[in-house]
């Protein structure tokens, strides 16, 4: 495992795929890691280069078309809504240029508020080349839903169903909001049941000890 401190003026995101590359071994204030993070990778045959070239995600979760298109593309969709110049990574998000990696974090144009995160969780790649409301699978009603599998073949030709942030098979979703100027008990968990794109969020205080009657 490895953990990186995100700068106070930046945001980061992960979507079921490791993204941390180089580890800052001599910066304990900003980077923590398992003592055997490299030796274990060597033992398992995941890495055989010099320590200074070790990349955590390349060793333990190497990216391919499926992981980039199905996972990192969701990170890209979020980043492009809050930060400038993210369209330069469109070819990476679509799985076409694996060397054009996105940064681990980006500096947003303005402070990110809860509503921005709510909207990001409801995304179907609208306004991008992967817009699920515009391709042939959307039908006549611009339906942004695709039933699995994500990859399929017809008459020897391979096709892809996008894996958007919002999906119909979601059981629940939430956004945690910490407000440092208020007591800890005033922290809020915005909680929703089912598909993020079609469900509402209910604020639940972290001090709650029982479920209220509705």
Task: Give the location of each predicted region.
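C-terminus-biased signal that marks the final domain/tail of proteins
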Residues: 1-214
């Amino acid at each position: 495992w490895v953990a990186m401190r995100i700068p106070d003026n930046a945001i980061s995101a992960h979507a079921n795929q490791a993204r941390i590359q180089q580890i800052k071994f001599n910066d304990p204030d900003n980077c923590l890691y398992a003592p055997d993070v490299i030796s274990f990778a060597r033992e398992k045959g995941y890495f055989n280069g010099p320590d200074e070239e070790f990349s955590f995600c390349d060793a333990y979760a190497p990216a391919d078309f499926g992981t980039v298109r199905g996972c990192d593309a969701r990170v890209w969709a979020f980043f492009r809504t809050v930060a400038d110049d993210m369209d330069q990574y469109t070819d990476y998000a679509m799985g076409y240029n694996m060397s054009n990696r996105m940064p681990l974090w980006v500096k947003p144009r303005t402070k990110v508020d809860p509503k921005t995160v709510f909207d990001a969780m409801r995304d179907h790649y609208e306004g991008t080349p992967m817009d699920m409301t515009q391709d042939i699978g959307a039908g006549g009603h611009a339906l942004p839903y695709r039933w699995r599998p994500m990859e399929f073949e017809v008459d020897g030709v391979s096709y892809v169903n996008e894996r958007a942030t919002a999906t119909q098979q979601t059981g629940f979703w939430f956004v945690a909001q910490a407000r440092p100027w208020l007591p800890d008990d005033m922290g809020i968990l915005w909680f929703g049941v089912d598909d993020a794109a079609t469900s509402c969020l209910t604020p639940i205080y972290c001090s709650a000890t029982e479920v209220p009657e509705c």
